[in-house]
Amino acid sequence: MSLMYGKYNICKRRLFETKTYNPKTLFYLSYKTARLNGLDLSTLPLTIRKLQNKIDKHILWCDEDIENVLGAERLTKWNFNIIQPLPVNVFLALQNLTEIPDWLDETMWVQFKWIYNKSTTFEFDDFQEKFIEHKHYEKICHNCFNRFLDHALQEMSTIEKTIINYIKPFDAGDILNILQDSYHWCEYCHITPLFRLIKIEY
């Protein structure tokens, strides 16, 4: 647009196109930025904090970066004293660790516990007119073995297993290696650790 100052015409040009944001869009963008940068949200008004879970779920549908942040947050509070499957975003956050986290003690007990599955299942193949032996995962968690057991009982099968259970102390660096080593996770579901972490009481 042009403005008249005395006898001179001054042309005022915009370097950037004007853009109007909806207040909801502005709130969404600012909240998302705060989450991605790990800002403390406890100072936000209570009305916003009450909407936090709802907003997080909405962002999860749109942006995997937020899911990574939420996974990292849940990882810091995860109870590795119980052998249980991890949510996928928590498991990925664990695998992406590049340094020893604060929630690991300098030295901890690691109890390894898994089922060595030596069972075999045979199914009759009508096309080849013979029994076909199925190969099964050997190093699995208790839940996956029970799933296999339910299936095996419906077929011609042999059920054989060995329970491995032993405990050793490890330093934090070694524990991080154990946490990120696929050898110590269930071969079938991949997200259940075959160990638990126990604090050493002095």
Swiss-Prot record:
Pfam families: NS3
Lineage: superkingdom: Viruses
Protein name: Non-structural protein NS3
